[in-house]
């Protein structure tokens, strides 16, 4: 099997795994009697794990272990943990196992990116073509857990633990396949200490003003973006969309198209404009949700347009962000830098977004009694998210001033490395 095919299959299974359990989880936990707060904390597991993931995939992988071997170990461990999590019926039993599972999975996002980056000749041209298979994997998981069982005459498996068991099996599969991936050895031999272990050596990249603005805006954007992941399925179901789990894969279908078109957009418009367009389309998506419902054809169409824009927004911001980080980070810090963005976005940003969204829904947007069949003021919630993103877009447009021909790796000399490792005071 050619290297590109191996990397593409890796991405397919990597994102199939996450999509299989993450989208339908709300339905299963709700049916199992978990409270809204417990469900919120369950979703926050991935964010908590992302905060710690640089320990596993940042500086350790950069210095000591081949990336594909680390991937195999994490996937095998995750398969066992998810299998046992699927057997639980109480929050006390489920939450620790899901958190432990998330600690094995979240590091692999940056890890698979790094494996792909290290084994393609032209990152800006080739990475989107490989990463698009991850989107197809997410779609496949939605179809497998949404439409497919019903098409075959079986009951809907979304509100059951079967998606979690599918996740466990898929994790074991990728664990085996990881041994057939191209060898991606460590690229640095620097001294190892606690600062390096935590990935803090990559923080030196924040001295670059444009990278700092990018990092800060990515952190802020992750908060309102989290509202979509935790609330969209419940919202779409409550306003009348049948089989929302399956229909939400439309966002990934649009992601495929724009992923393949991404090299054209980045070359034609530049990285800054593409990142900005990702923010703008995210705000518009929430705008469509404000007015969407299943009552009329027009308002029903707004729901589907909102779902489709999710793929556009994700591609234009986050996939472009991975490319930008790879361009800015020195070669020996690239895995740590990808882990730093994971820490920023899927970690602290998402965690705060899940908690902020939960508090806002409970304190400000929950109806005492159902209003027109709705238990929450969804329009108010989506308005709040849209305004947040609009403000972030304005900040990014004003303060990020780096043009494409100015994007080069941040220079890190021996003294900088010594400072990050505590050798110079």
Curated annotation (Swiss-Prot):
Residues 1-8, 60-63, 112-131, 183-210, 266-287, 361-379 are periplasmic. GO terms for cellular component: plasma membrane. Pfam families: Nuc_H_symport. Residues 30-38, 85-90, 153-161, 232-244, 309-339, 401-425 are cytoplasmic. The chain crosses the membrane at residues 9-29, 39-59, 64-84, 91-111, 132-152, 162-182, 211-231, 245-265, 288-308, 340-360, 380-400. It is found in: Cell inner membrane. It comes from the Bacteria. The keyword Glycoprotein does not apply. One of its GO terms (molecular function) is cytidine transmembrane transporter activity. InterPro entries: MFS_dom, MFS_trans_sf, Nuc_H_symport. Keywords: Cell inner membrane, Cell membrane, Membrane, Transmembrane, Transmembrane helix, Transport. Could be involved in nucleoside transport. This is Putative nucleoside transporter YegT. The gene is yegT.
């Amino acid at each position: 099997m050619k290297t590109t095919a191996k990397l593409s299959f890796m991405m397919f299974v990597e994102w199939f795994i996450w999509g299989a359990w993450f989208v339908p989880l709300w339905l299963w936990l709700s049916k199992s009697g978990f409270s809204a707060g417990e469900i919120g904390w369950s979703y926050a597991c991935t964010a908590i794990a992302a905060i710690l993931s640089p320990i596993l995939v940042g500086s350790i992988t950069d210095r000591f272990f081949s990336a594909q071997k680390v991937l195999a170990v994490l996937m095998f461990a995750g398969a066992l943990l998810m299998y046992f999590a699927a057997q639980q019926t109480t929050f006390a039993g489920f939450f620790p196992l899901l958190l432990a599972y998330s600690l094995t999975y979240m590091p692999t996002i940056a890890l698979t990116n790094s494996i792909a980056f290290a084994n393609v000749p032209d990152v800006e041209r080739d990475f989107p073509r490989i990463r698009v298979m991850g989107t197809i994997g997410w779609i496949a998981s939605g179809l497998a857990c949404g439409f497919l069982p019903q098409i075959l005459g079986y009951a809907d498996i979304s509100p059951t633990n079967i998606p979690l068991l599918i996740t466990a099996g898929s994790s074991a599969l990728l664990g085996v396949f990881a041994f057939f991936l191209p060898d991606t050895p460590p690229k640095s031999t620097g001294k190892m200490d606690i600062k390096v272990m935590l990935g803090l050596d990559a923080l030196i990249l924040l001295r670059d003003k444009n990278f700092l603005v990018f990092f800060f805006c990515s952190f802020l954007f992750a908060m309102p973006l989290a509202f979509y992941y935790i609330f969209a399925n419940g919202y779409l179901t409550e306003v009348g969309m049948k089989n929302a789990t399956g229909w939400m894969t439309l966002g990934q279908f649009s992601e495929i198209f724009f992923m393949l078109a991404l090299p054209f957009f980045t070359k034609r418009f530049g990285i800054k404009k593409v990142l900005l367009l990702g923010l703008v389309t995210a705000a518009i998506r929430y705008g469509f949700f404000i007015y969407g419902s299943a009552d009329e054809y027009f308002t029903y169409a707004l729901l589907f347009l909102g779902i489709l824009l999710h793929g556009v927004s994700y591609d234009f911001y986050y996939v472009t962000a991975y490319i930008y980080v790879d361009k800015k980070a020195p070669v020996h810090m690239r895995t740590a830098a990808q882990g730093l963005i994971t820490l920023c976005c899927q970690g602290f940003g998402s965690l705060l977004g899940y908690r902020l969204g939960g508090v806002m829904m409970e304190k400000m947007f929950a109806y005492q009694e159902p209003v027109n069949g709705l238990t929450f003021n969804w329009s108010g919630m989506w308005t709040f998210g849209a305004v947040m993103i609009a403000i972030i877009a304005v900040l990014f447009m004003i303060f990020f001033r780096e043009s494409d021909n100015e994007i080069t790796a941040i220079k890190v000399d021996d003294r900088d490395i010594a400072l990050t490792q505590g050798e110079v005071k």
